[in-house]
Amino acid sequence: MDRRTSLYLYAWRNHIDVDYFPMQTAEAFSVPIGGTCAIALDPTKIRSEADEAVKLSHELGHCVYGGFYNKYTPFDVRAQHENKANAWAVYRLIPWGKLKQAVKNGITEVWELAEYFDVTEDFMRWAIAYYTERKNYKFE
């Protein structure tokens, strides 16, 4: 089963609706609804299968840990919610052990790693920084 299919299956198994429709500015978003969650993706703003997987897994991250921010409260930190959603997506799409093994096998350029894991280059950069700077993991 390919990565995108497994993400959609994960959403289905967890009663998370995923819908597609054009949006003015957003590329994707998720909202809590009745004890579960719904995700919207703008199909006109999906640039590749890798981009779709990154966007979907990020929004699933919001749904899984319940990280939704409220612009009307001063106590809500948007960056914190975004980082948690990205971290969930990283663990799902680029597990540390597999990333470390890929590097050990000689796949060292960001574009090569992004291609290997079928994610965007920007997301791969975020994942590498997350593992090496925040988690202090080493490639040795």
Identify the residue ranges that each predicted region occupies.
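Active-site hotspot residues in diverse enzymes, especially metal/ion-binding acidic/histidine motifs
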Residues: 1-140
